[in-house]
Amino acid sequence: MDTRRLILVLIFTFSSFMLWENWQKYNQPKPADAVAAAPVSGAAPTPSAALQAKAAPGTPPVATPVSTAETFSITTDLLKATISAQGGDLVSLELLNYKEHDDIQKNFDLFDAKHQYLAQAGLIGEGLPTHRTTFKHVGGATKLADGTDELKVRLESADQNGIKVAKILTFKRGSYLIDIAWEVANGSDKAIAPHAYYQLQRDDLAPAGETKMVSTFTGPAVFTDADKYQKVTFEHIADNKAKFTKTADNGWLAMVQHYFVSAWVPKDKTQREFYMRKVEGSNVFQAGVIVPVAEIAPGAKGEASVSLYAGPQMQSALKQVAPGLDLVVDYGWLTVVAAPIFWALEAIHKLVGNWGWAIVVLTIMIKAVFFPLSAASYKSMAKMKMLTPRLAQLKERFGDDKQRLNQEMMKLYQTEKVNPLGGCLPILVQIPVFIALYWVLLGAVEMRGAPWILWIKDLASADPYYILPVIMMVSMFVQTKLNPTPPDPIQAKVMMMMPLIFGFMFFWFPAGLVLYWVVNNVLSIAQQWQITRLIDAGGKAANDAKA
């Protein structure tokens, strides 16, 4: 296989990878065993008979419309949360350390009203408050004070049949975790056994900044110890074909999007039931978890609490929140390669303090690891380049006899001790590393808003002036000049077009990925030029000796 075929193989492999990833996203196979998810109107969910035990859920009360409900804000060192009096819903959650994709003057709002994205919670049981019930904020601070580590927000609903209910949200310093707790005081004359539900609501539209060239998964996901990480598409929920674990005594439920995640994390060994559903007549979906509250005798109090993580997909933080939560940073089928690459990138960043330079250093390290393979490849290419005139002569002599031409070419390769596959195999070995690095740079929230130098203000966004893609095209053009020229004029023209095709594709790729490619190309050019120069010098010396 000569150089032109090698490059064509690389292009075909990369293109196939991109097509496969997008095919998986839009054409996932139909699951055999589906969990029913009938359209709903936004009412409280109903637990299954197995989870209900003695509970008898009733009809939720009529709520104040969202448009007329009052709101108030809570501010910590990391968050600015807006809470609605209706249900005590989290209707806005600004992440103070992250900016909007299309307006860096604004904080990124995870619970974005444009996507009808919010976190809701309620109780299931006759007369008990749901996410449609009006609550009252019972005083207290709305800003985390200096020197304090947590801020509690207490909401109370109107008494129903002697039952008093309070919803307490606890915000913590330096954390994206919010504890959502229920206090139920049973002043009635009979025991009650309510359930608490916690759900995330969102439409099916991709977040701002997503393109088909660099699209990632958006939708709900479930994790349990038994069945591990399970992504569920909005399409499968809408078609009643969603497949996921429904009951367990461990695990969490999340709503995933590029760079960020919100997840309900009940306490371990608490029996729970996961559900997903489409709100009737809309493109809005709800995914949640139901947990039982212990039976509350007359005159007694009961409590239930679940943690909500709502923030960036920082792997180190996610691992501490719950087992498997770091899997929302999805590297696909190359996780075994991508995970150590990210670990190395993070370690380098701690030393150099800049993610752009960390990418440069990591590229040099990867190039050093593959140096022997690359050297073997470039030596083979250089020898093939020296044989180009003789191969052209053979083609001119035996062009009409393909079998004889191939025989003569193989004789030439054997005589000159050249392996035509030598330039291909070493580079093919590196393809999984490149694809894994692609997913690392695409999925790492650390790259979002991270500057490099001068005009590169965000390594997760495309180069605004297309300087890096142009440099990449130039570097690829130089590489084609260092490679053997195809004897076929048409193939030669195709090879000359490849830098333009690749460069055009990379106009929309994250700058961090293009930076890796540029640095890799520059190092490859230097290595290939040096090897070619040495081989040319050796060949010339051998010819002089023969003369």
Swiss-Prot record:
It is a multi-pass membrane protein. The chain crosses the membrane at residues 6-26, 328-348, 351-371, 425-445, 459-479, 499-519. One of its GO terms (cellular component) is plasma membrane. GO terms for molecular function: membrane insertase activity. It is found in: Cell inner membrane. GO terms for biological process: protein insertion into membrane; protein transport. Pfam families: 60KD_IMP, YidC_periplas. Required for the insertion and/or proper folding and/or complex formation of integral membrane proteins into the membrane. Involved in integration of membrane proteins that insert both dependently and independently of the Sec translocase complex, as well as at least some lipoproteins. Aids folding of multispanning membrane proteins. Belongs to the OXA1/ALB3/YidC family. Type 1 subfamily. This is Membrane protein insertase YidC. It comes from Dechloromonas aromatica (strain RCB). The lineage of its organism: Bacteria, Pseudomonadati, Pseudomonadota, Betaproteobacteria, Rhodocyclales. The gene is yidC.
